[in-house]
Amino acid sequence: SLNKFIKENRVMHYMTHSMSAYSKPLFETLNERLIYLRLVRNPMTDYMVNHLAKWCERWGKDFRSGVTLIKFEEKYFPFFAKDKIPEYSELSPHEKAIFLLKLWQEKGDHQIDQFKSKYNSFILEIPFESLVFQPMKYINKIAEEIGVTADKVTKKQLKLQNVPRKSLSDAPFNKYYFDRGWRKSKKILSLEEEIEILRKKISNYVSVDSLECLDEL
């Protein structure tokens, strides 16, 4: 029951994508009870752009996609783009993906910067590129905040995900990610080398303007 949940002081986990730009209700409702972990990643990856491009194609066509849609000139668009529909509608699926990544990043940055001074919530921003190389740096901070310690279960999960890694893409094989563009490097590459390789791939299917936008992010 709810009373038992509250009495035992349980931790309620809630995870979703692209949340920071729309997270105000969480901060307003929970305030000092909220532990907000913002995992961010360099968007210069063909996996991320390809994955989001597929969703951009689905939004407006499939009403089961789980996203609130708005109607404009007899067509449906995801609510994220409500203020820039004419611009958004002219883009290819991959360019729409980059458009939304920029929108979420900038709006999310603005919101979180405001919330840090307005609310007493615990906010931890975690760069994915740093997490896979130095996981305990962040795990220990989270564990301390919720009053626990990293144990053998934690270590087992890290091992299953091959963390810490020798390179960014040195992850265990996953068909879902593979089908959307992820490829494990055949040799150990630096973060800069991996990003440059991915940038060249992405440049083959987006405009110069979209690529420059991705560079800025």
Whereabouts are the PLM-identified features?
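Conserved aromatic-histidine-acidic binding/catalytic patches
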Residues: 10-18, 35, 61-64, 96, ...
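PAPS-dependent sulfotransferase catalytic domain
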Residues: 1-56, 106-118
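Cytochrome P450 catalytic domain signature, combining two hallmark sequence patches
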Residues: 55-61, 148-152
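PAPS-dependent sulfation machinery
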Residues: 1-15, 28, 62-88
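Short C-terminal domain-edge/linker segments immediately following a structured domain
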Residues: 44-48, 67-72, 154-159
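A polyampholytic, Gly/Pro-enriched intrinsically disordered region
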Residues: 57-69, 172-180
